[in-house]
Amino acid sequence: MYASEHAAELVVARSLNPVLPSLKTVRRVGPDYRKGRDITGEELCATFGLCGVEYGEWLPDKERQESLNSCFDAFCDLADVLKVERTAIGFHGLLAVAFGSRGVSNALAHFEPLRFVFNLTRMKGAGSVAHEWFHAFDYFMGARKEGIKLDRRDPDLYMKTKDVVAITEQLFNDDPFADLVSGLKGHYLFGEEAKQWLIEKREGIFSRYLLAADDFVRALSEGCCCPVTADQRQRATALVDHLSSWVHDSDLYKRDTDELTRLFSDAMGWSVYRFSVSNACSRLLCIAREYLKAIESEKKNDQKVCVGRSKYYIESMLIDLGRCKPYWSKTLELAARAFGAYVERRLEADGRLSQFLVHSHKNECYSDANPYPEGDELDYIENLFDSLFSSVSI
């Protein structure tokens, strides 16, 4: 829907790489959990269940202390947003944090799933904590889904993490993570809007069916190699009329599509007929099946329906156009950025600010790209994250 309505804008290929804005000062508004005192690395690990803290060789002592204090505040804020125990933030002794070390290329922050550590680069890593933490959560839950127990004390941890696939990259159904992935990539309508869209879709398909039915009857009259008996013509016409009447059948969605095939087979009493007849018959059958599917969807999904790709997903694919392989539109990156936007919105709703944890996760902060969900899509994604974290334990 979004793509069709904004086709003219989306034609232009863009080679973009939106970068999180650097902050001169990192601000925070919220409870003073430290009571103004400095935090040690040992205290950070004990409070949040981290296995360790690593510092870059060239990180000055003052900056090291600022990083510890800011990270402590950020993790407290994150635990508040997620409503989890603080030790769950470090996955009970699994996660390590590095400040100004283990950097990768030009990344502001980077999570290493093989070692279960994320690095915040010197000066520029502020605002990436929520994003990188979700990557860790993604792999942690992926391991759990696959039955792989990750334990920092396990000498085979490195080999085990090599086999882990992020849970947002796995294929499964009827799961809060599956709902999240669908919500990230799909554009949904709800309530009366959903009902009306489904009705209009069904009516449009039925209009196409009537046209296909006319083509089928015409092909019977004009395209047969062998004479068509009056009985065959009568049965074929009756079949078309019968299918057309299904629009008034309240139990239509229960009909099996195999019944359609059988009805057509019974009607086709002759063995040799031109391609035009076969083609018209196949088209009619295909549209009839599509109509059945629309009816079934209308019965099952009258409160929610996916009508196409989300604006968030489309914009992410546009950013990837100039890249040799997808990055922004990868599922795990869509999820991590959306999580950052979710955390930022949750903090704002409570009158709080935590820029070391997350900042600038709004499209208005970027002049030529839209890397984050917004509006109604963010509203829906926010509810999905709420459902997710209320249904899983860390």
Give the predicted meaning of each segment.
Residues 59-73:
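A short, highly charged nucleic-acid-interacting micro-segment common to nuclease
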Residues 1-63, 85-394:
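Active-site-flanking segments in enzyme catalytic domains
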Residues 78:
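Divalent metal-coordination and catalytic microenvironments
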